[in-house]
């Protein structure tokens, strides 16, 4: 059942009772140059469709507690966009986790670009030298994979497939006219979250290994083994979050972890931090910490400014919305913002579709360039398995 939560402009289709109708609404809004987002929160059986007929606006401040209900989107570097919830639909969905299926098998139809391979491993090697020289402790380098395929591409069908494949992720489809592309993500990483009871939450997510062993069997989280490099990489993110807490003299927090979690075809190390903002009378915490945390050590590096400068030098592509953040704010007095990982930018024209996948990895002194390359391959496959099958 679909519930109309807010007013729907008369220019939009009035009968919305199925995925097909949501598809019509998506196409109509895109034609009218409106902004929109469709999402499903982790482990949720509800999906939402938000429309802003103005196309959204850029923001100069992040006073989250003063925002109306809407959807916030920020690039890696730059001002965020805000989509106001002029129209907000909610629908219950049936979810089934896909385990041991084709979504977890290696892809054979994605050609490896040797030039990209050489460029990426070269800059990983250069990054290791910089770390050994003491210029920074950690840096996150990313790359892209571009794939073209013919025929019509259904954003909402892809969204539904991602929801089914990755029930523990935040799954989102997004369109902002000023950006001109559609974005899809299935991200495991919470950046800033606060529920209606005032419990604030953020996580440190880093360290990556395949969830599939050489025999094709799934590795359970409790059986994962982590190298010193991966443990240290995740520890950098934990220390970064705690340093942000110290900057605002926040001492009353709970830290749980690290523990191994399954995110699609990958395993990660995760530590969770929670704060009771009602007890502390600190309702402004989400907005304050959002400004301090982003971009985190998990998608940038340590120290932050040195890492950002190195990324600009090493990466040939613009990250755009990759490694930024996105999510609904002030819907039911809750905030859910996630790091935009496991993401793809989709451009359609003349019956063809071009998908640009983004993936990155944390480089430390103990990194191996070829292993880091393979990590990005696995991360790209998170979405490739769904969109290209």
Show which residues each predicted segment covers:
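Short Lys/Arg-enriched alpha/beta "domain-start" segment
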Residues: 2-54, 149, 156
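An anion-binding catalytic pocket shared by soluble metabolic enzymes
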Residues: 31-37, 41-44, 148-233, 252, ...
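Non-catalytic accessory segments adjacent to catalytic cores
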Residues: 43-154, 248-251
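Contiguous alpha-helical scaffold segments within structured protein domains
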Residues: 93-118, 124, 144-149, 203, ...
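Conserved hydrophobic/aromatic pocket- or pore-lining residues that grip, position, or stack substrates
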Residues: 134, 192, 239
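A short glycine-rich, hydrophobically flanked beta-strand micro-motif that places a catalytic Asp/Glu
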Residues: 139, 170-175, 319-327
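A glycine-rich phosphate-binding loop feature that marks nucleotide/adenosyl-phosphate handling sites
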Residues: 175-182, 241-242, 258-266, 325-328
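Conserved hydrophobic core element of enzyme catalytic domains
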Residues: 284-389
């Amino acid at each position: 059942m679909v519930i109309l939560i807010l007013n729907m402009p008369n220019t939009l289709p009035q009968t919305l009772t199925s995925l097909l109708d949501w598809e019509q609404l998506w196409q109509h809004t895109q034609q009218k140059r409106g902004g929109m987002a469709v999402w499903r929160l982790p482990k949720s059986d509800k999906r939402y469709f938000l429309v802003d007929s103005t196309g959204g606006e850029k923001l100069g401040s992040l006073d989250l507690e003063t925002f109306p209900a809407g959807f916030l989107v920020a690039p890696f570097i730059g001002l965020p966009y805000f989509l106001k919830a002029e129209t907000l639909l909610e629908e219950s969905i049936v979810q089934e986790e896909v385990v041991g299926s084709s979504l977890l098998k290696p892809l054979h139809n994605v050609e490896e670009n040797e030039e990209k391979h050489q460029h990426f491993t070269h800059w990983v090697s250069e990054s290791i030298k910089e770390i050994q020289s003491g210029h920074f402790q950690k840096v996150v380098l990313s790359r892209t994979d571009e794939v073209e395929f013919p025929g019509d591409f259904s954003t909402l069908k892809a969204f539904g497939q991602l929801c089914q494949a990755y029930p523990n992720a935040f799954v989102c489809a997004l369109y902002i006219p000023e950006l001109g592309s559609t974005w899809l993500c299935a991200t495991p990483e919470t950046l800033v979250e606060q529920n209606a009871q005032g419990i604030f939450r953020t996580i440190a997510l880093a360290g990556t290994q395949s969830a599939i062993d050489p025999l094709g069997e799934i590795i359970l989280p409790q059986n994962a083994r982590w190298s010193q490099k991966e443990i240290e990489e995740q520890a950098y993110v934990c220390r970064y979050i705690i340093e942000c807490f110290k900057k605002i003299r926040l001492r009353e927090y709970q830290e749980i972890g690290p523990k191994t979690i399954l995110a699609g075809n990958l395993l990660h190390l995760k530590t969770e931090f929670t704060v009771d903002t009602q007890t502390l009378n600190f309702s402004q915490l989400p907005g304050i910490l959002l400004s301090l945390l982003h971009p985190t050590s998990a998608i940038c590096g340590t120290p932050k400014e040195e890492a950002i400068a190195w990324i600009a030098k090493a990466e040939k592509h613009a990250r755009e919305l990759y490694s930024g953040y996105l999510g609904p704010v002030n819907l039911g007095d809750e905030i859910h913002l996630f790091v935009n990982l496991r993401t793809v930018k989709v451009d359609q024209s003349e019956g063809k579709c071009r998908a640009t996948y983004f993936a990155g990895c944390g480089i430390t002194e103990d990194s191996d360039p070829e292993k880091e390359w393979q990590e990005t391959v696995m991360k790209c496959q998170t979405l490739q398995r769904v969109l290209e099958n």
